[in-house]
């Protein structure tokens, strides 16, 4: 019994010593945490004598300024703390004392990645702050930029990828989190604009997918490949932009025309096909948004390209009943299409014209598809497809008015379809 008592006493002493050590460590961590937040560089230097600069801090639940969205006891590296809270003086002090900018947290983020994840939102249009709130917002932005400059000046790897399943680069993160102002800075500091993530998407793919014209313009200016295709799907930036712009949200917001034109003006191949054989025009026709379809036609999109399943752009257009209501656009597409293929490889007609209310239209289109065109009509279609909308008025100056009207007159077909509901 006596031996048990003595051993228990020694255990109590050891436990007490451990508690004292933990208490001292907790106090040290809390003081260093507060010094970093307050940018008290003298205190930081003093505390780093007893705390390795690349050792994480563990902040307990009673710390007043810890991140609300994180677990209160989650460890954080001092340099990550300074970067997340945009404390340039603390960041510089830590780097000067040997902090490693490439140290990663439990999610695989480096200091630069965390800076981009926590970049302050910027929706201000004023150039000079006039209120206290504007001044605070401007100071926050300036501190973020200064921290970014300090990191890059101290060798932060701008092409390091996040160590997780996405493998995003800094440029990918900048686009995801809307940090447009840093794109050019990263590119100027060596960021690879054509780097791909785990999904084989480049930064341009991501910018096009969200229809951010400023980001697209910046990336192209720094050499982004506008025709790079995602390996898994074959989608290009143009196809992604058309898909988003043709969606319900894109239609409601009237978004994307500027982005698509920007891509086309910078060499995007309008007739590029994905792995299923779809072009941007197939996507646009399925969406049925007239502005997007017209823009692609202006840049000589081919209305006769078939997918691997034998579907033409007009087949995609006729898939949705909402598209069929726009008879003028339908007529324009029909007048460019030859031969008219209404069914796919399985012989299935588009779902839209299979509805009972479109029976007469379906019968009319089937007759048109089976009726061979005259040589004159084929020639007119060829001229329309070669010159397109882009050079149509230039052609008007060269041809007799009657001939030009016969080539570009589509009202007869519109009239033919007018009787449908």
UniProtKB/Swiss-Prot annotation:
<dbReference type="GO" id="GO:0003677">
    <property type="term" value="F:DNA binding"/>
</dbReference>
<feature type="repeat" description="ANK 8">
    <location>
        <begin position="309"/>
        <end position="342"/>
    </location>
</feature>
<dbReference type="Pfam" id="PF12796">
    <property type="entry name" value="Ank_2"/>
</dbReference>
<feature type="repeat" description="ANK 4">
    <location>
        <begin position="166"/>
        <end position="195"/>
    </location>
</feature>
<feature type="repeat" description="ANK 6">
    <location>
        <begin position="233"/>
        <end position="272"/>
    </location>
</feature>
<keyword id="KW-0238">DNA-binding</keyword>
<dbReference type="Pfam" id="PF00023">
    <property type="entry name" value="Ank"/>
</dbReference>
<dbReference type="InterPro" id="IPR036770">
    <property type="entry name" value="Ankyrin_rpt-contain_sf"/>
</dbReference>
<keyword id="KW-0677">Repeat</keyword>
<dbReference type="InterPro" id="IPR002110">
    <property type="entry name" value="Ankyrin_rpt"/>
</dbReference>
<keyword id="KW-0040">ANK repeat</keyword>
<dbReference type="GO" id="GO:0005654">
    <property type="term" value="C:nucleoplasm"/>
</dbReference>
<feature type="repeat" description="ANK 5">
    <location>
        <begin position="199"/>
        <end position="228"/>
    </location>
</feature>
<feature type="repeat" description="ANK 2">
    <location>
        <begin position="74"/>
        <end position="103"/>
    </location>
</feature>
<protein>
    <recommendedName>
        <fullName>Ankyrin repeat domain-containing protein 61</fullName>
    </recommendedName>
</protein>
<dbReference type="Pfam" id="PF13637">
    <property type="entry name" value="Ank_4"/>
</dbReference>
<feature type="repeat" description="ANK 1">
    <location>
        <begin position="27"/>
        <end position="57"/>
    </location>
</feature>
<feature type="repeat" description="ANK 7">
    <location>
        <begin position="276"/>
        <end position="305"/>
    </location>
</feature>
<feature type="repeat" description="ANK 3">
    <location>
        <begin position="107"/>
        <end position="146"/>
    </location>
</feature>
